[in-house]
Amino acid sequence: ECATADAINFMAKYGRGLICLALTRQRIEALGLAMMERRNESRHETAFTVSIEAREGVTTGISAHDRAHTIKTAIDPKFNERDITTPGHIFPLVGRDGGTLVRAGHTEAVIDIARAAGYDNPAGVICEIMNDDGRMARLPDLMTFAKDHNLKIASIADLIAWRRRNESLVQRMVETTLTTRIGGSWRMMIYANTVSN
């Protein structure tokens, strides 16, 4: 919803990295997207799908407007696999169920943030930031970048700590009464860990 042409242009101009769209596994399945590689051997196990484009409403697909339109189409639940084509100029990533509590990655972090912000269809656009010399920006560089562009900055560790403080990590699955021969009735509840695989 917030992926405007201006925001995408900012990422392309100042971020300089690959612009990716982090989506939940459920949304990836609804769009019928195949994984880029079945046997993911990348160092961080980033789960890329095939690249995408909106089927309608784009020209070349690469402009900030076209990429923002593709992102909005991919996120909006009223659209499905018939509204997306491949290949394209947006690179979807599959977030793991359980988010940063299962995998402490950028993909999961942006989905966790969107979910915490109350979005019904949590997703987010990410772009790694390159310095002027072509090297990837590290924390001191990112702190300066955030200050220069009036952006907020937080770590994945901060997000994980926030989730542990503010979310219930268990869910009641079953509640029943258990009557025994030796001691009357007991109220029995079974809980499940919501972040285990």
State what each model feature region is:
Residues E1-N197:
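Catalytic domains of riboflavin
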